[in-house]
A protein has these predicted regions:
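Hydrophobic beta-strand-centered segment that forms part of the acyl-chain substrate-binding groove
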Residues: 66-99, 104
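Short beta-strand micro-motifs enriched in acidic
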Residues: 32-33, 103-107
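Non-catalytic linker/capping segments at the edges of enzyme domains
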Residues: 1-46, 155-158
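HotDog/MaoC-like acyl-thioester-processing domains
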Residues: 1-7, 92-94, 105-158
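Short coil/loop residues immediately preceding or within conserved phosphate-binding loops
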Residues: 15, 81-83, 113
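A conserved, well-ordered hydrophobic junction motif at loop->secondary-structure transitions
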Residues: 39-63
Length: 158
């Protein structure tokens, strides 16, 4: 499935914030679907550090949200995040090669239950893990949002 034409040069779908630069600014590399698991290399740039050599928790959550959502596109379905829970197990280092893995735990109707871990590339022990619910995007999803925001800005909340 095409991601609305918003891919990097290699064909990887990109979010709205990254389309203009043609790469993932969070540091996520090419997503690969291998059986039931989506994997991607990721490296936290030191601009996202919280403490010395440690990634900010917001960066970690953003990477989970981004890659877990894009993993459904690899399976042919565009989704939106309904909920995301992150467990921070160990400090996530900056400027180190990491791997994120995403698994589909359950899928029924529009609901996709996903789990994910981030780990060092050379170590299987998770540094952080996430689980969440993604919903298949209905036609007109973003148009409805824009209409609602236009009404809000005009003082007509819906």
């Amino acid at each position: 499935m095409r991601a609305n034409g918003f891919e990097s040069a290699s064909g990887t779908p990109l979010c709205g914030g990254c389309r203009g630069v043609g790469r993932c600014r969070l540091g996520v590399g090419e997503l690969q679907l291998d059986g039931e698991v989506t994997q991607a290399p990721v490296r936290c740039n030191s601009v996202y550090h919280a403490g010395p050599g440690v990634a900010h928790g917001g960066w970690t959550a953003a990477v989970f949200d981004d890659v877990m959502g894009r993993s459904s596109i690899q399976r042919g379905t565009a989704t939106v995040t309904a909920s995301l829970k992150v467990d921070y197990l160990k400090p996530v280092p900056v400027d180190e090669l990491l791997v994120i893995e995403v698994r589909v735990e359950a899928q029924a109707g529009r609901r996709w239950e996903l789990s994910s871990i981030i780990r060092l590339a050379a170590d299987d022990a998770p540094l952080a893990r996430a689980e969440g619910l993604w919903l298949e995007r209905r036609k007109g999803h973003f148009e409805r949002h824009e209409e609602a925001m236009s009404a809000y800005r005009e003082g007509k909340p819906g």
